[in-house]
Amino acid sequence: MVLPASMRLRGHRCFDHLHRRGKRYYGTWMVLRKAPSNAKLLRRDIHGLLTQTQPHSCRIAVVISGKVHKRAVVRNRLRRLLHDHLRLRFEARSTHSDVWLLISLRPGADADEANLLEECDRLLEEAGLQP
């Protein structure tokens, strides 16, 4: 299942915020960036209303470069795998953090799904986001 729209992080200003202000946690196959949320940076529609309904919740983006794998099918499968894993982790939590997360995969991250998910959990725990 895909990540719900209320949990997705979109827009170049949000990504710039994460790159400038985010704390980085490094793993073998991925980098996790965590920053406090900033509702002013979220996308708005033509009427000035937020396009996403919950401005104060955990929002997540997964970025997978073409260097990870040359085939888009493989990159999309990895993105869906991480989206589903993160959705299950954050929906199970009773309290929602007011943070934004950006997960960037490094080249070679398509090696083993189990190791990838294990590393994701380890980085979330290191960032203080694992229950």
Curated annotation (Swiss-Prot):
Enumerate the Gene Ontology biological process terms: tRNA 5'-leader removal
Which Enzyme Commission numbers does its entry carry?
Answer: 3.1.26.5
Keyword Chaperone assigned: no
Q: Which reaction does it catalyse?
A: Endonucleolytic cleavage of RNA, removing 5'-extranucleotides from tRNA precursor
Query: Would you name any one GO CC term?
Result: ribonuclease P complex
Q: Which GO terms describe its molecular function?
A: 3'-tRNA processing endoribonuclease activity; ribonuclease P activity; tRNA binding
Query: Which keywords does UniProt give here?
Result: Endonuclease, Hydrolase, Nuclease, RNA-binding, tRNA processing
UniProt key word Cell division: no
Tell me the subunit arrangement.
Consists of a catalytic RNA component (M1 or rnpB) and a protein subunit.
Function text: RNaseP catalyzes the removal of the 5'-leader sequence from pre-tRNA to produce the mature 5'-terminus. It can also cleave other RNA substrates such as 4.5S RNA. The protein component plays an auxiliary but essential role in vivo by binding to the 5'-leader sequence and broadening the substrate specificity of the ribozyme.
**Family membership noted in the UniProt record:** Belongs to the RnpA family.
Q: What is this protein called?
A: Ribonuclease P protein component
Give the source lineage, highest ranks first.
Bacteria, Bacillati, Cyanobacteriota, Cyanophyceae, Synechococcales
The encoding gene is: rnpA
